[in-house]
Amino acid sequence: MAATTTIPLLLLLLAATVAAAAAELSVYHNVHPSSPSPLESIIALARDDDARLLFLSSKAATAGVSSAPVASGQAPPSYVVRAGLGSPSQQLLLALDTSADATWAHCSPCGTCPSSSLFAPANSSSYASLPCSSSWCPLFQGQACPAPQGGGDAAPPPATLPTCAFSKPFADASFQAALASDTLRLGKDAIPNYTFGCVSSVTGPTTNMPRQGLLGLGRGPMALLSQAGSLYNGVFSYCLPSYRSYYFSGSLRLGAGGGQPRSVRYTPMLRNPHRSSLYYVNVTGLSVGHAWVKVPAGSFAFDAATGAGTVVDSGTVITRWTAPVYAALREEFRRQVAAPSGYTSLGAFDTCFNTDEVAAGGAPAVTVHMDGGVDLALPMENTLIHSSATPLACLAMAEAPQNVNSVVNVIANLQQQNIRVVFDVANSRVGFAKESCN
């Protein structure tokens, strides 16, 4: 009798284990193997960081409705995942972006899009364009829909409304898109009626645009976790591969199942109503080696009114600190390195030195301290970047761009590589765990 009851119990446990497993996708970076060295590649990528940082630190222009821009004045994210869109599924490489809500894809026909490999709505039986009467339309900034008639009390009949259309800037260009829905496939998971922007034309240079589209992983109603409902239980994580590992991939895990690491240390996730897509955390201090960095009081304080605080972002390349924080960090780092020939600047980096002149172990590690007792000790690869041709290394962080809105610190993807970062929106927390992602 015991055996007959044990077998069904084991089957139930097995089914629960399978159901709890997280979906997993490979994550690739955009650094090409022919690049001269990781240092030169990162310098080139970091040139576009300033525009993204200004976007992250600026407040929403209007109050009221919570909107999700199809795109922004940001630089393209550095990492991509393979996803399927449509029925039958069409494979696309979508840029991974934790600071954007909306997903969008370049759609055919589009003679000005940056890639010839476009999503073809005509080949998908589940594709549908969405009219201005769609409840999703007001959530997108920049929609071109007719205003309500009859003194603002009555709207045109749904059948007479055009497709909800957009024209939005992105980097140095802008694109025109229509609101649509289709089946999004991530690994073995299928999410029907997924709302996204279908890009039909691009104006301006396309060099800095994602080649095929973007996957929005922010916190707003248009983002993946919101549209997926209970499928992923409000949790995803990623482990980003090193810029040095051209031929290796990291992973994006969706869901709170067994695929997420057990040794995660969590810090509370803060929310800014003006930038509700962003993942804010409360940094309490920095240390270089065993020395705490002396920063002015309140330098890390979260302020929803101004946007000040610290954001964890997948699309910014190098970590930026506001002027007083970075000045103090740089001073302590230089004091400990004590490079005999001093320091030079290279691209965005102002603390580069000759490694031949510094004793072994002379470059100290940087640790980011957060609420909840989280001490994110950055590996040396995440602290310094090296030239492959010369004995030159640079502190892989920089000062935030000087602008009235540049009040936000950003923990960027270079400092996150080979670390599992868990975004647990359901429990309002962000977690970190060491992991070899390559």
Swiss-Prot record:
One Pfam family assigned to this protein is TAXi_C
What Gene Ontology terms describe what this protein does at the molecular function level?
A: aspartic-type endopeptidase activity
Cross-referenced SUPFAM superfamilies: Acid proteases (SSF50630)
Q: Which organism is it from?
A: Oryza sativa subsp. japonica (Rice)
> Disulphide bridges in this chain?
C107-C113, C352-C394
Q: What induces it?
A: Down-regulated by chilling.
Q: Where is the signal peptide?
A: 1-23
The chain positions of domain Peptidase A1 read: 79-433
Function text: Anther-specific aspartic protease involved in tapetal programmed cell death (PCD). Directly regulated by the transcription factor EAT1/DTD in anthers during tapetum PCD and degeneration.
Q: What is this protein called?
A: Aspartyl protease 25
Question: From which domain of life does this come?
Answer: Eukaryota
Enzyme class (EC, first level) = hydrolase
Q: Which gene name does the record give?
A: AP25
A single BP term in Gene Ontology: systemic acquired resistance
User: What keywords would UniProt list here?
Assistant: Aspartyl protease, Disulfide bond, Glycoprotein, Hydrolase, Protease, Signal
Instruction: Tell me which residues this entry annotates as catalytic.
Output: D97, D313
Q: Which residues are glycosylated?
A: N123, N193, N282
InterPro entries given in the database record:
Aspartic_peptidase_A1 (IPR001461), PEPTIDASE_A1 (IPR033121), Peptidase_aspartic_dom_sf (IPR021109), TAXi_C (IPR032799), TAXi_N (IPR032861)
- Family, per entry: Belongs to the peptidase A1 family.
> What EC number(s) are associated with this protein in UniProt?
3.4.23.-
